[in-house]
């Protein structure tokens, strides 16, 4: 185990659902929670928790989110380049914005971008607007972000050649 402080992450509940399973003996009710954790400096994690009670489901979702943390490349409180992410029937498009624009995003993508530490961004959701799909598409798109230095290293070029 790594010695990390758990309080370094902000936690947000994106969705709490009451779900039921019908059996021969009647309906069994349980809860499903989608949670996100982030440090506001480029790290984000998403987790799903299921349990018979809401508090247990929340605890499981946050624990799962902390296990799935990924590092995102940011540039001046925005993203370095345009990107699109897809999850299920959801397609999410994101573009960098000038300082002072704010987070122009809806649904779960706004909450995730705020947890990551993005302050200026433009987004557009196409297809399904289901919170779970939007959250996953947002994280998948953020994982694809690369800085100019990373792209130059992958292509075997210098940074000035990439930016020109």
Swiss-Prot record:
Residues 9-72 form the S5 DRBM domain. It comes from the Bacteria. GO terms for biological process: translation. Transmembrane segments: none annotated. With S4 and S12 plays an important role in translational accuracy. The N-terminal domain interacts with the head of the 30S subunit; the C-terminal domain interacts with the body and contacts protein S4. The interaction surface between S4 and S5 is involved in control of translational fidelity. This is Small ribosomal subunit protein uS5. It comes from Fusobacterium nucleatum subsp. nucleatum (strain ATCC 25586 / DSM 15643 / BCRC 10681 / CIP 101130 / JCM 8532 / KCTC 2640 / LMG 13131 / VPI 4355). The gene is rpsE.
């Amino acid at each position: 185990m790594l010695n990390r402080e758990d309080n370094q992450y902000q936690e947000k509940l994106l969705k709490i659902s009451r779900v039921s399973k019908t059996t021969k003996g009647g309906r069994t009710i349980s809860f499903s929670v989608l949670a996100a954790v982030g440090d506001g400096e480029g790290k984000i994690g998403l987790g799903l928790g299921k349990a018979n009670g809401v508090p247990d489901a929340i605890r499981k979702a946050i624990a799962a989110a902390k296990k799935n943390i990924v590092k995102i490349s940011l540039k001046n409180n925005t993203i370095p380049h345009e990107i699109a992410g897809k999850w299920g029937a959801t397609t999410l498009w994101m573009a960098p914005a000038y300082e002072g624009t704010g987070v122009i995003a809806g649904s779960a993508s706004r909450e995730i971008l705020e947890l990551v530490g993005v302050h200026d961004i433009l987004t557009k959701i196409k297809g399904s607007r289901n919170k779970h799909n939007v959250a996953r598409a947002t994280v998948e798109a953020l994982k694809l972000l690369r800085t100019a230095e990373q792209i130059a290293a992958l292509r075997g070029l210098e940074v000035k050649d990439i930016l020109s």
